[in-house]
């Protein structure tokens, strides 16, 4: 069965440094797929290529049966980067209005999506403040709202819960599970193993390669462990 997102034999270098090598992914519609690994493992580079912000040196990437990069696909992809791309001199509401205006939403849809996303990330009472006054956690929450503003078919979130308090993290994950139920396809990069365990499938990335893939429960059974951290440790030792 072909997936909503297909990555086939993808490699990427920056100068002489090989960042990703021979990456394969097949992510099905309505799945949450976790990319886990240490900083510098290549997770962010991979999601940027899936979005179409970077191009691979070798291999092919398809999203919704279209080869990336493709400008029209951005209407269907919600992307939250690791570093917040926000306008500090504007208010939270003005940021949401600006990004909503980039998509094919009528005025009524824009208003509804702004209300929904602001409430989801618990910023509805902070929207009149300038983003320059926001804390780091508030900026992450606004970035997440922007990633969801156009009701995208594909949602790609790079470390979405960094700097967010535990209660809101639970709320965000509950919403991701609801979106999954609507048939949205979601990629999440994370260092947090408890979050990885909520994914349908995970790919463990280390030194530019995928060292293990599978469902969280399947991987725990394979390595005969109860703790998902131990899966990553054992898979890493196997690579060496």
Question: Where are the regions that the model predicts?
Answer:
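Helix-to-loop junction immediately C-terminal to a conserved catalytic motif
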Residues: 51
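Conserved ABC transporter NBD signature motif
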Residues: 59-75
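Conserved ABC ATPase "signature" region
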Residues: 97, 101, 108-126
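Catalytic Walker B motif of ABC-type/P-loop ATPase nucleotide-binding domains
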Residues: 155-159
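ABC ATPase "signature
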Residues: 213-214
């Amino acid at each position: 069965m072909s997936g909503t997102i297909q990555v086939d034999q993808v490699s990427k270098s920056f100068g002489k440094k090989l960042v990703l090598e021979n990456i394969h992914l097949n992510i099905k519609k309505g799945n949450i797929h976790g990319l886990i690994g240490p900083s510098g493992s290549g997770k962010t580079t991979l999601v940027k290529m899936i979005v179409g912000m970077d191009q691979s040196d070798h291999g092919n990437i398809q999203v919704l049966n279209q080869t990336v990069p493709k400008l029209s696909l951005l209407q269907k992809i919600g992307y939250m980067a690791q570093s917040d791309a926000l306008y500090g001199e504007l208010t939270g509401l003005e940021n949401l209005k600006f990004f909503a205006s980039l998509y094919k939403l009528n005025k009524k849809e824009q208003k509804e999506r702004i209300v929904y996303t602001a409430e989801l990330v618990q910023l509805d009472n902070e929207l009149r403040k300038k983003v320059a006054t926001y804390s780091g956690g508030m900026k992450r929450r606004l970035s997440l709202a922007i990633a969801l503003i156009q009701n995208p078919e594909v949602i790609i979130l790079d470390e979405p819960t960094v700097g967010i308090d535990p209660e809101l993290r639970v709320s965000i994950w509950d919403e991701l599970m609801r979106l999954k139920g609507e048939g949205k396809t979601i990629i999440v990069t994370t260092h947090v193993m408890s979050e990885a365990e909520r994914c349908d499938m995970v790919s463990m990335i280390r030194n530019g390669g995928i060292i293990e893939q599978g469902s969280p429960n399947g991987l725990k059974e394979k390595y005969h462990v109860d703790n998902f951290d131990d899966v990553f440790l054992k898979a890493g030792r196997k690579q060496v």
